[in-house]
Regions:
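GHKL/Bergerat-fold ATPase module in large chromosome/replication-associated machines
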Residues: 90, 111-136, 155-158, 165-303
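GHKL (Bergerat-fold) ATPase N-terminal catalytic module, capturing the glycine-rich phosphate-binding loop
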Residues: 1-156, 160-161, 169
Length: 303
């Protein structure tokens, strides 16, 4: 859960900086290539999420992370850990995503510097009640002259998140279509070893239909539907109203072997803001359409 949420937050920070660059031309000049890095340090039991997005100042830290000191946070974490339907409910509440990291950590520190500002700040908390914010003069704590680094001290029970392969699997499942490139770096590997972006960074359904070729539709169908044939029919449209959503669905050209099995689940993937939520949502489509393959993505779906 926390991996998906922190990657989404990092991506949002990069998008905010990109938007800011429309009015402030020099804000990205020194470091124009936006990215998200996940660094794993097994020796120190630490995983770090680093972005070169817009960053935060002291006021932003208090407004965005200060609520960690409220008593309701502990109750929220308790409900989240006990929830049997967390894939469909609590996890989808992106506003509280940062707090989910305390489920696997005994301590979190946030090092950040806002774009265009000189001061660097460090926020720390154990997730119990208090947090601290301190100014730091060492600007080399960040790789860029702006952005945020979140250091998470992983508990013994959750060491699976220090496995590079495991983290890469999570990224490919939940954050594959985020437009910002995501890199996973293992601290035990050689420093000169080149890392490639884990995510495909191609949410094809967000593009205009006349910009997508038949071959690109087929490749996406084969990828998302885990099918090897050609789609018999492609349906791609955007619905607007109280809730806006985009649909890219395919009818397979070959009949699934379990088409008439009443226990067969639908294979549509639900996304919110290009972030995967679930592929097990019975109410998404009628049972008689469960042979469909594809995605439904919404910017404002209430989860």
């Amino acid at each position: 859960v926390f991996v998906r949420e922190l990657v989404s937050n990092a991506s949002d920070a990069c998008d905010k900086l990109r938007y800011l660059s429309n009015t402030k031309e020099n804000v990205m000049q020194d470091d124009p290539d936006l990215r998200v890095e996940i660094e794993i340090n097994k020796k120190e039991n630490r995983i770090s999420f680093i972005d070169n997005g817009i960053g935060m100042n002291r006021k932003d830290l208090i407004n965005n992370l200060g609520t960690i000191a409220r008593s309701g946070t502990a109750q929220f974490l308790k409900e989240l850990s006990e929830s049997k339907t967390k894939d469909l409910s609590l996890i989808g509440q992106f506003g509280v995503g940062f707090y989910s990291a305390f489920m696997v950590s005994s301590e979190i520190s946030v090092t950040t510097r806002k774009a265009g500002e000189k001061k660097l700040w460090i926020w720390k908390s154990d997730g119990e009640s208090n947090f601290s914010i301190e100014e730091n003069d060492n600007l080399d704590l960040l790789k860029s002259n702006r952005g945020t680094k979140i250091d998470i001290l992983i508990t013994k029970e959750n060491k699976e998140y220090l496995d590079k392969v495991r983290v890469e699997q999570i990224i490919r499942k939940y954050s594959d279509h985020i437009s910002i490139p995501i890199y996973v770096i293992d601290g035990s590997e050689k420093k000169d070893e080149k890392n490639e972006a884990i995510n495909s960074a191609s949410a094809i359904w967000t593009r205009q239909k006349n910009k997508i070729t038949k071959e690109q539709y087929k490749e996406f169908y084969n990828h998302v539907g885990q099918m090897f044939d050609d789609p018999w029919l492609t349906s791609h449209y955007k619905a607007e109203g109280k809730i806006e959503y985009t649909v890219l669905n395919f009818i397979p050209s070959s009949k699934p072997f379990d088409l008439y099995d009443p226990a067969r689940e639908n294979r549509l993937k639900l996304y919110v803001k290009k972030v995967f939520i679930t592929d097990n949502c019975p109410d998404l489509i009628p049972p008689y359409l469960r042979f469909l393959r594809g995605v439904i993505d919404s910017e404002d779906l209430p989860l």
